[in-house]
Amino acid sequence: MSQFNLNELNALPKAEQAAALALVNGQLEHLTAQERVSWALENLPGEFVLSSSFGIQAAVCLHLVTRQQPDIPVILTDTGYLFPETYQFIDSLTEKLQLNLQVFRAQQSPAWQEARYGKLWEQGVEGIERYNDLNKVEPMNRALETLGAQTWFAGLRREQSGSRAKLPVLAIARGVFKLLPIIDWDNRQVYQYLTQHGLSYHPLWEQGYLSVGDTHTTRKWEPGMSEEETRFFGLKRECGLHES
C-alpha cells in the first residue's frame, strides 16, 4: 500500500475512486487498530485530526491515536447542551492524555438559537436535523477547514448501529480521508483496552447510559431498547457528523 494523494483520488471518477479505496480497505481489514493508525500516519497526508464526542468509549480512540501522534488536534464540537459529567470527562481526559483539544461551537449561542428557532430538538426529525446542522455539522466543517485537515481519525464502530454496520476502515468524507481504526471492535474489545490501559468509560456508563450526547436527546437504556433508541427519541441515530 503506497502513499495516497488526496487531490488525485478526489479527482478520479467515482467508480475508480471506489475501486482504489476498496483495494486498500481489503488490506486494512486485516490489520490491528494500532497498525491501521501507523499505516495512516505513514501513507495518508497530514494535517491529521481526531474527532471525539467524549462519549461512553471515547478514551479508547483518544489513547490509541495519541500514543502514536501525541500532538494531533482533537476536535470537539460543543453544543452547549452536554451533560455536566461530559464536561468533567473532557477535562479529565484532556489532562490525563495531554490532549491538544480544539473546541468548535455554533456561531449562535444556545440561548440565541432557542430565541430564534425555539427548541429545535422538539420539532421532529426536521428540527433535529436543523439543530444538528447548526451545532455539529457546520462547526465540524469549520474545524476541518481551519485546521487544514487532510486525514480525519474517528472512533466509530460497526456494532454501534445499523447505519454504521457497513462502514469501511478508510473512506473519503467532506473532502478528506477518514480512517476508523476500531471500526470492527466489539464491546468486549473496548472493555479490554480500557482495562489494560487504566482508562475509564464515561461517568454516565454506570448510570445506565449506552450512548451519550446532548442532555435533551439522550436517554438511559431500559430493557428492550436498542442502543439506537437511546438517542434522538429513536427517530434517528446519526447527528450528521458521520453521514456522507
Swiss-Prot record:
Record NCBIfam families: cysH, PAPS_reductase, PRK02090.1
Q: Provide a GO biological process annotation.
A: sulfate assimilation, phosphoadenylyl sulfate reduction by phosphoadenylyl-sulfate reductase (thioredoxin)
This protein's superkingdom?
Bacteria
* Compartments (UniProt record): Cytoplasm
Q: Which Gene3D superfamilies does UniProt cross-reference here?
A: HUPs
Q: Which PANTHER family match?
A: PHOSPHOADENOSINE PHOSPHOSULFATE REDUCTASE
The EC number(s) given in the record are 1.8.4.8
| The protein's role, per its UniProt record | Catalyzes the formation of sulfite from phosphoadenosine 5'-phosphosulfate (PAPS) using thioredoxin as an electron donor.
Q: Which InterPro entries match?
A: PAPS/APS_Rdtase, PAPS_reduct_dom, PAPS_reductase_CysH, Rossmann-like_a/b/a_fold
What does the sequence similarity comment in the record state about its family?
Belongs to the PAPS reductase family. CysH subfamily.
Question: What catalytic activity does the UniProt entry give for this protein?
Answer: [thioredoxin]-disulfide + sulfite + adenosine 3',5'-bisphosphate + 2 H(+) = [thioredoxin]-dithiol + 3'-phosphoadenylyl sulfate
| Active-site residues, record numbering mapped to chain | C239 (nucleophile)
Protein's name according to its UniProt entry: Phosphoadenosine 5'-phosphosulfate reductase
- Protein's pathway: Sulfur metabolism; hydrogen sulfide biosynthesis; sulfite from sulfate: step 3/3
Q: Which HAMAP family match?
A: CysH (MF_00063)
Q: Name one GO cellular component term.
A: cytoplasm
